Amino acid sequence: MTSNQKFDPIAYVKSRKEAEARLIEAGAYSPEMEHDACGVGFVASIDGSPRRSVVDAAIEALQSIWHRGAVDADGMTGDGAGIHLSIPRDFFIKHIARTGHSDDGGRLAVGMVFLPRNDIGAQEQCRCIVEQEVLRLGHFVYGWRQVPVDTGALGDKALATRPEIEQIMFSMPESLDEEEAERQLYKIRRRIEKAVLAELITDFYICSLSTRSIIYKGMFLAEQVTAFYPDLLDQQFVSNFAVYHQRYSTNTFPTWKLAQPFRILAHNGEINTLRGNSNWMSCHEDRMEHEVFADSINDIKPVIEKGASDSAALDSVFELLLQGGRSLPMVKTMMIPEAMDVSGDSKLAKLYAYCNSVMEPWDGPAAIAAHFGDWVIGGTDRNGLRPMRYTHTTDGLLIAGSETGMVHVDETKIAECGRLG
């Protein structure tokens, strides 16, 4: 395209889909073999209290690792960036009021949803499916909120493929404990995904559906995250943790839904054992059962979506094990173990011997940041092939990420710093 030719978004989307189909048919490309080399990390309030400083530090860190992401020739389309935060109740209560409802004191749940932008009928169909599944369990829907976005922060190609971005806000009974509420939402989301797919709607994706946390992400540059999502600049948007990610696609077609963080983790690296891990997961599904899923076990199969990238597949299995009742550190230990001689007599060796008998390791260069429940963690692969640095401040913040110095911290406030691995 010459400099005086106008960008045609419809033609671009069509040619992109045709190119992807040709490459898949020729065996030159498969979505399942997508890998990334990215920037990743988290910020956490050590005492668990929500703070604006956590959000500000995470935004600063994300914007500092812009060089770890790719930039399209248009100069503004990125491979993807995003941030995962706890839900700020006060922020959403004021938006619930704008729907004509008042906060009923129940568990507030929020879903961040990508809808087909150019098909109004499909949009409404998706909303109906989402509401039906939420209402089926007796929850009260406050309404939908159109997320404010500034499309001027996007490049031509990101704009051409941009979804309609909305949030569904609803209330769950306070009598539900947090774990059961999250498990219900997991099953609801999986049923929604299947129902939408059955209607042959492909441009639909739920970034997050939770009473705990919410994910803002997209196909923009890291430094544009707050420009595109002005919500993140609201001083009422506070959080006790933030997981952030800047994507660099090494062999992929960047898409909005493949931007990270995913629902549990943000991942820098690649899973070299992906095909074997996926095959083993399919085998496990045949005998998979758990009392907490009971008759709904088939709603969550297949665990790994067809065509999922390595990071998305890893996230899906992480999520399953967590929803089954395991803790986040334990799931990381099972799936991305450290190098260990399991034939030894130490308690740690016996732990890893047990883990190896339960779950095949997902191996390859990796650094992850993840959140679930009361945990936020960072970790690396057994060979330490992806970096992860951390800083603990005297004012109670823990900052971890791919590089040192992503967040400016006065030296007098550094209690401890170092590296993982």
PLM features per residue range, with description:
Residues 2-421:
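Conserved short alpha-helical segments that host acidic/polar catalytic motifs at enzyme active sites
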